[in-house]
């Protein structure tokens, strides 16, 4: 890779950019102006390389990967792009020479508001790895104006605020209005015969213009550049000047406002018809624009669609982009004149599906009437796909109950996961356990009929970002022990650290690195939230999307128990213990919001109890996001991965903690199973029911009261929910939810969890043993690198060569 700048040439480029774009010079520029100048200078370099990459891809007729995801949780881009381009040291020095503090400038950049949780972060990691591995790839999503939301905690409760990330973030975007695509909703279908072919046209539809805003993505140690194409929504109709002249200003701009609503926010609330309609519009808008763009570029290169599947593979990240299947069929038949069989043959060899959940409520289903009204032609095609699929299923199984389960359209609903399975060349889960559950339970009949479609690709993380970039102290240790920077392209080189697991000097250095990271995070937390953290305390962390199956509430129950023990015996805790939470709840998820309120109520109670001072602390970090995780991961010592076994598809936070030397307290769920495969019992703190045991317990009749009646400590803990804490709020609703149904088996695992936490705290006191375990975790984390996962996709699903 050619390094684009020296420190001096970078200084000159920044000064020139400030003058040309902002009419100022370094001595007068604001931090915001300098931040944008940095982004624009790096964007220029990447854009030039992107042009060269596209030219080579077209000339050599390389097969291309198209990665569709409703989320791309990119985080901040300046430091990442400078790192990948090999100019991070030069950028820091240049900024210093120009009178700016690089650290302050990096902190000023907002996270790109394009995602919510693990789904979007995975997509971002994979895009980085695809680029680093020199795979011609494009990511596709929506250019959300406000993204998810900015979380504010007010009186202990979550309040959602708009997250306007584009102020600075727009500097990374390259608008391409000349490549805009028209997307049609509603309308009336008219059929006619011409030249022996049936033609179908959609008349009187509402048209929205999808305008691409491209974010260029640099890979590590390569001149290869890929693109994240984000679709912005625009009206095709200008403001009605006649209405405007009459003073009807809102009505004059109605079409414009309705169109732009599509790209306003990620996951609009869908517990009403308008919300469902907007979500479906978002999904079709993003899919239709993407497919049109892919097809247009393919035709420019090859002049035919007959070889589409040979030169393109479309990976759909969960069911949100599932409409890509009927949309491809629509274009192949209605616009390219193919017959059904030819169009289906190409489509079903072009699309691959990654499943990310076993939760039934997350396997999307759309009301048939809504699809029929909004997308009349797509609905016709779905009907025919469903009819042919049902015929195939009936001929294979001869069982009406199986036909019902596998149906794409049934009971007035369109089942998107079944559509993906029917129309995809591949179906993969994201951990070994998850993929087995898909084959044995969720899609067991599909697996029986078409076993060759099903495979596993365990998730991975961008180890360059989540170790080297955010944890320079640990990066230095790895380089010293594992052969320099070789591990950045060959993450399995981390395994070399295993040889030092009993080296006292290495373990002492590892301990010092963790201590410094804790001090650094404590300073960050004080400045950001005004909270005081004791670096001597155990940093026990659970940060992830708030959902009942992830069992933040189980963590809370253990903390309440610990608090009650401390009230009984102030000497029962000798080592300070800080529990750190970070989580956003979906705006309409009332129970999740109540759990956030509970965490903050408990934190407030403990902080005002003098018996807890210097012994027990609970901190909820508001607005958890990628940039906050980057501060927290290096300082974390205990990683809480405690989902109900069989419910978490994989998880990637568990991998990030592991890579930074935190020890896992967890169930055998998701990728924890594969972590256990490489770590063994001795290097993590496992507890609780296994997936098959949990399923059996539920099937045979789970009665929470049986566990309560045999455990006085549990009963006392639960009663605390009813009583509430110093803010006077009762959590009777959560109490009743646990004792009456406890869907995610918190009480069944409560005692084992408390025991696991006790084992962890005891082990923590033996620093040599703890650091020995920590080093093994780091050494064996290389298998969870995104480079490995992307290489598996490339070899086993996409059939594309890679570096």
Question: Where do the PLM segments sit?
Answer:
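A conserved ligand/cofactor-binding region detector
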Residues: 1-803
């Amino acid at each position: 890779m050619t390094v684009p700048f020296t420190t001096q040439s970078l200084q000159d480029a920044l000064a020139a950019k400030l003058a040309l774009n902002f009419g100022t010079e370094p001595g007068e520029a604001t931090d915001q102006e300098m931040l944008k100048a940095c982004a624009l200078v790096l964007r220029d370099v990447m854009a030039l390389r992107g042009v060269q990459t596209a030219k080579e891809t077209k000339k050599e007729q390389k097969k291309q990967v198209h990665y569709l995801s409703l989320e791309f949780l990119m985080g901040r881009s300046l430091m990442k792009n400078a790192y990948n381009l090999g100019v991070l040291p030069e950028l820091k020095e240049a900024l210093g020479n120009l009178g700016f503090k690089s650290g302050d400038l990096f902190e000023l950049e907002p996270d790109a508001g394009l995602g919510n949780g693990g789904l979007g972060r995975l997509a971002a990691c994979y895009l980085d790895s695809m680029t680093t591995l020199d795979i011609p790839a494009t990511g596709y999503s929506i250019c959300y104006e406000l993204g998810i939301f900015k979380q504010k905690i007010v009186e202990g409760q979550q309040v959602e605020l708009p997250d306007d990330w584009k102020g600075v973030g727009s500097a990374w975007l390259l608008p391409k209005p000349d490549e805009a695509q028209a997307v049609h909703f509603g309308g009336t279908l008219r059929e006619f015969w011409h030249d022996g072919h049936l033609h179908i046209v959609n008349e009187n539809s509402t048209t929205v213009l999808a305008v691409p805003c491209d974010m260029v993505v640099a890979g590590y140690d390569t001149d290869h550049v890929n693109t994240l194409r984000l679709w912005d929504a625009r009206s095709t109709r200008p403001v009605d000047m006649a209405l405007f002249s009459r003073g009807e200003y809102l009505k004059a701009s109605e079409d414009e406002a309705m169109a732009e609503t599509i790209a306003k926010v990620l996951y609009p609330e869908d517990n009403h018809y308008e919300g469902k309609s907007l979500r479906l519009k978002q999904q079709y808008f993003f899919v239709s624009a993407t497919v049109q763009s892919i097809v247009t570029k393919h035709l420019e290169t090859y002049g035919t669609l007959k070889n589409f599947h040979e030169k393109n593979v479309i990976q759909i990240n969960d069911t949100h982009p599932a409409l890509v299947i009927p949309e491809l069929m629509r274009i192949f038949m209605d616009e390219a004149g193919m017959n059904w069989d030819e169009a289906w043959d190409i489509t079903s060899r072009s699309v691959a599906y990654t499943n990310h959940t076993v939760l039934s409520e997350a396997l999307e289903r759309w009301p048939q009437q809504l699809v029929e009204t909004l997308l009349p032609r797509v609905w016709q095609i779905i009907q025919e796909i469903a009819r042919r699929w049902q015929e195939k299923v009936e001929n294979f199984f001869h069982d009406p109950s199986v036909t019902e389960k596998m149906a794409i359209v049934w009971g007035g609903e369109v089942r998107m996961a079944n559509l993906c399975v029917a129309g995809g060349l591949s179906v993969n889960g994201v951990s070994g356990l998850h993929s087995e559950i898909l084959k044995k339970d969720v899609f067991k009949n599909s697996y029986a009929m078409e076993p060759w479609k099903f495979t596993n690709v365990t998730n991975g993380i961008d180890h360059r970002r989540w170790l080297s970039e955010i944890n320079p102290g640990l990066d230095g240790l790895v380089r010293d022990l594992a052969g320099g920077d070789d591990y950045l392209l060959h993450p399995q080189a981390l395994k070399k650290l295993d040889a030092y697991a009993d080296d006292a000097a290495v373990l002492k250095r590892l301990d010092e690195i963790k201590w410094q990271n804790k001090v650094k995070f404590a300073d960050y937390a004080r400045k950001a939230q005004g909270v005081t953290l004791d670096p001597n305390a155990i940093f026990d962390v659970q940060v992830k999307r708030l959902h009942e199956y992830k069992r933040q509430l189980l963590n809370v129950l253990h903390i309440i128990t610990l608090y009650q023990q401390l009230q009984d015996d102030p000497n029962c805790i000798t080592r300070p213990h800080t529990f750190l939470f970070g989580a956003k709840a979906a705006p309409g998820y009332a129970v999740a919001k109540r759990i956030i309120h509970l965490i903050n109520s408990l934190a407030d109670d403990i902080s005002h109890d003098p018996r807890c001072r210097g012994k027990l602390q609970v901190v909820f970090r508001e607005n958890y996001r990628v940039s906050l995780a980057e501060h927290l991961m290096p300082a974390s010592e205990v990683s809480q991965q405690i989902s109900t076994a069989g419910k978490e598809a994989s998880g990637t936070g568990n991998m990030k903690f592991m890579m930074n030397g935190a020890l896992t307290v967890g169930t055998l769920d998701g990728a924890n199973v594969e972590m256990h495969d490489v770590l063994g019992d001795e290097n993590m703190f496992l507890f609780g029911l296994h997936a098959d045991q949990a399923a059996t317990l539920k099937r045979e009749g789970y009665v929470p009261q049986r566990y309560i009646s045999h455990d006085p400590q549990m009963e006392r803990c639960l009663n605390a929910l009813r009583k509430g804490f110093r803010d006077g709020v009762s959590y009777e609703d959560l109490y009743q939810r646990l004792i009456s149904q406890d869907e995610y088996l918190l009480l069944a695992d409560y005692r084992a969890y408390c025991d696991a936490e006790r084992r962890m705290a005891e082990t923590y006191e033996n620093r040599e043993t703890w650091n020995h375990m920590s080093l093994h975790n780091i050494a064996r984390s290389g298998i969870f690198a995104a480079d490995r996962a992307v290489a598996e996709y490339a070899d086993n699903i996409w059939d594309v060569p890679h570096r």
